[in-house]
Amino acid sequence: MQETAFDALVRSRRSCRSFQEATLDEASIRSILQAGWLAPHAGATGVALVDKRRFFVVRRASAAHGRLSALALERVKANRKRLMIARRFVPGLAAKTANFMKRLDALSGGGITTLQEASVWIIAAERKGFPPAEAKSIAHAFQNMWLKATELGIGFMLLSMTGMLSADTAFMAELGLAKGEWEIDGCLIGLPARPSTPNVERLPESAVAWLD
């Protein structure tokens, strides 16, 4: 089957690892948010989307960015300390978390570089419900936003460490959300520092099983 424009868009969607120090126009930001708003949500919870999905736009030059990024770094350092203690006492945990520990070490020592580079930090929040599906709903929103950003030539990067801040009272208070009632996650958008190369991988037959 011949590839379509959508196939090309999906192949072009790559995680942006470095950003230019440039400012995004509000119209582009809003179009990305609109794509996220249209993403599927957990309708089985019985709560309307307007009552359970929120987006927080944190511009790099804003005072809010300074406060929130400082709280994020504090949380990273606290989690690193807790994990270091746990690794001493839980058998096998040190080996299992080796790569993650290196990541925490880098973030704790040098800060969250891409957070300081990107034009905008978008925090998505979804109200918790039953059955719990808020994390999936945020993931759906980010997939839509990522595709829209790619279409606009804007770099996009998931900032998954934002998720751990759902349990941070001070951070959630900055957003005006009650800790324990909302799940959050984040992404970064901005003009990419360098062009990305489309993904040329093909689906291998070994990854597919046709069940009769």
Can you say where each PLM-predicted feature lies in the sequence?
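Short, surface-exposed beta-edge/turn micro-motifs
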Residues: 52-54, 118-121, 183-184
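Solvent-exposed alpha-helices and their adjacent loops that cap or buttress functional pockets
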Residues: 47-50, 113-116, 175-180, 201-202
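N-terminal amphipathic, basic helical "cap/leader" segment at the start of enzyme domains
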Residues: 1-115, 212
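Small-aliphatic-rich amphipathic alpha-helix that forms the alpha element of a beta-alpha
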Residues: 36-39, 122, 126-171
